[in-house]
């Protein structure tokens, strides 16, 4: 499958200009391993950028079981979809390793997306990659006929 040979699961590459830009506008958050920093139903009120470390993001099934949605490492954003839509989180997120995040509050995120092509393009690229990752996940699920007439 072509997905196995793609770079979809990798961030866009380390961009020192982007990192400096985010550091200038964000609030640093240092997390120990196994720290939960986002819960289902929580209004996160902003977007996180992973500067160092690794995070895992889980969904909960109807039977209460957890499923790993994705693992993100240095260079990824998290929370951009729920931030744009002003919706609560639909995942549980935790640090897997010592992790450094930068949090951009809701208003700052929207302003930077509007004003900075560098920032906007990075967010759009990563959102597109996450969409393709989810599409791949759907591809591997068994399909159940629904009886379309």
Outline where the language-model segments fall:
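Cyclic nucleotide-binding regulatory module and flanking cytosolic helices
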Residues: 1-33, 77, 82-83, 115
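Polybasic "coupling" helices that flank or enter modular domains
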Residues: 114, 118-149
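Short active-site oxyanion
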Residues: 7, 99-100
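Cyclic nucleotide-binding regulatory domains
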Residues: 10, 35-97
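Generic anion/oxyanion-binding catalytic loop in active/binding sites
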Residues: 23, 42, 98, 139
């Amino acid at each position: 499958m072509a997905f196995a040979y793609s770079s979809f699961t990798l961030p866009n590459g380390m961009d020192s200009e982007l990192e400096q830009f985010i550091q200038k506008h964000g609030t640093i958050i240092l997390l120990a391993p196994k720290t939960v920093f986002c819960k289902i139903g929580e209004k996160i009120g902003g977007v996180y950028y992973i500067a160092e470390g690794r995070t895992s993001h889980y969904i909960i099934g109807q039977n209460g079981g957890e499923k790993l949605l994705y693992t993100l490492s240095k260079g990824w954003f998290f929370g951009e979809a729920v931030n744009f839509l002003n919706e609560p989180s639909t995942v549980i997120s935790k640090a897997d390793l010592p992790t450094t995040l930068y949090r951009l509050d809701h208003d700052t995120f929207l302003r930077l997306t509007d004003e900075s092509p560098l920032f906007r393009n990075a967010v759009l690229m990563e959102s597109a990659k996450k969409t393709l990752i989810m599409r791949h996940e759907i591809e591997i699920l068994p399909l159940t006929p629904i009886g379309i007439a």
